[in-house]
Design a protein with these regions (language model features):
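Membrane-proximal intracellular helices of multi-pass ion channels
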Residues: 1-436
């Protein structure tokens, strides 16, 4: 039985949080004295009103949450955050249709990064900031806000964590899920602030630094410039953003162990991190060498363009520092393949995730060994732990469904007249809708 009252109460709290972010954007609109002030104020009022109604509906709720309730809350959070989040775009008139405004906002909250805008730089500062903020909020999952506030209601967080956590295995930095969520948000905020400081030091203005740091840490890819990172024409900025895209692709539990505990041993014993480092290293080396011999770039520029695009695409961020579709076919084909990999589970990235690729690789290896030794017992171990048959089946099912969705999307787009290569690229990109 779904606990509708508790769901309503939690959603009410989330709506108030979103209203707070909208008010923050209205302050920015006032500071720049631009035309989107009223749009943000109306949006905040509507969202807060919905929060009040939901809170009243959840009055005297029974203090329990089932796994089913967790999935309902996660689903409703994504949908309603996008519905209320689209209001500033629509009410300001900069995105005049509801469908386009909803698409832009949902793309932000899911950190997909797809956009219907063809002149991003025409948006006022408030809307540009809100656009970046949608990705930052969605980066670790809206529900992590809920996990942080659940103790206020006297409700456990485990079911929500199970519904939102990425990857086939779930790591905790603390026995209490709420504490885990708060530590993860601390790291998330710390990465964002550090990147802002470094980008400002490199000559990017403060506003652009904030917006790009929000979307880098979220691995979302929204930029304040139509030409993305290429518009800044700065090697320093490219290297800094590459570094933080890479860090955002690491499991946040490992970042906690690294930055807050100084536990380097466990960090470098992690199987998934080995795969992440290995794939980024291999793809970067191959792309660099190929660019040196097939492009006008020098050695340093070839390396810089290669590592930026490899990290950007593997972490499903989507920032662009060069038009890789103009590179030789083997490279842009490789870039399309890299999109599928994803980085680490427990990070802000989409894609299949390296942990699933590692598990399937070892399962395949064991199957070949079984051909030679039919009676051998060959467990699959990840981080020195045996992976259960249930987890292996779940990984196989996920990869199958993921590839099936891409294939179907690819075919549908081609039916509507989209070209072969473009249809594939779009299908893969849109399938990064927070693929858990």
């Amino acid at each position: 039985m779904i606990n509708a009252k508790m769901i309503a109460r939690i959603m009410g709290a989330l709506f108030f949080i979103e209203a707070g972010f909208l008010i923050l954007c209205s302050f920015l609109a006032v500071y720049y004295n631009e035309s989107d002030i009223s749009a943000f104020l109306y949006s905040a009022a509507i969202t807060a009103g919905a929060g009040s109604i939901a809170a009243l509906a959840g009055k005297n709720a029974e203090k329990r949450i089932s796994r089913r309730d967790g999935y309902v809350i996660v689903t409703l959070a994504w949908v309603f955050f996008s519905l209320f989040g689209m209001l500033p775009f629509y009410l300001s008139g900069y995105i005049p249709t509801i469908t386009d405004a909803f698409f832009e906002t949902m793309s932000g909250f899911t950190t997909t990064g797809a956009s219907i805008l063809d002149n991003i730089e025409s948006l006022p500062h408030g809307l540009l900031f809100w656009r970046s903020m949608t990705q930052w909020i969605g980066g670790l999952g809206i529900v992590f806000f809920t996990i942080a506030v659940l103790p206020i209601f006297g409700v456990g967080s485990v079911q929500l964590f199970a519904a939102e956590a990425t990857g086939p295995t779930h790591d905790k930095v603390h026995p209490r899920i709420g504490v885990t969520a708060k530590w993860i948000w601390t790291i998330y905020l710390g990465l964002t602030i550090t990147e802002i400081i470094l980008l400002v030091a490199g000559g990017m203005n403060f506003f652009d630094s904030v917006c790009h740091s929000l979307t880098t840490t979220a691995t979302g890819g929204y930029s304040t410039k139509q030409n993305s990172i290429a518009a800044f024409n700065s090697p320093y900025i490219e290297y800094i953003i590459t570094l933080f895209m890479f860090l955002a692709g690491i499991n946040f539990t490992l970042l906690y162990l690294l930055f807050l505990k100084g536990n380097f041993k466990r960090l470098f014993q992690n199987t998934e991190l080995h795969w992440y480092l290995g794939t980024v290293g291999f793809f970067t080396l191959f792309t660099t060498v190929t660019l040196i011999f097939t492009s006008p770039f020098g050695i340093e520029e070839s390396f810089r363009k290669a590592i930026f695009q490899v990290v950007s695409l593997q972490t499903t961020t989507g920032f662009i520092s060069a038009d890789y579709m103009t590179w030789v076919p083997v490279l842009w084909t490789l870039m399309c393949i890299i999109m599928l990999f994803g980085a680490c589970a427990g990070s802000t990235t989409g894609g299949i995730k390296c942990i699933r690729i590692a598990i399937m690789s070892r399962v395949s290896k064991n199957e070949f060994k079984h051909i030679i030794h039919p009676n051998a017992i060959l467990p699959v171990r990840i981080n020195r732990q045996v992976i259960s048959s249930t987890t292996k089946s779940a990984v196989l099912a996920f990869i199958f469904l993921y590839m099936a969705i891409i294939f179907i999307g690819w075919l549908v787009l081609m039916l509507f007249g989209v070209g072969f290569e473009e249809a594939y690229s779009v299908a893969v990109s849109y399938t990064h809708l927070r693929a858990h």
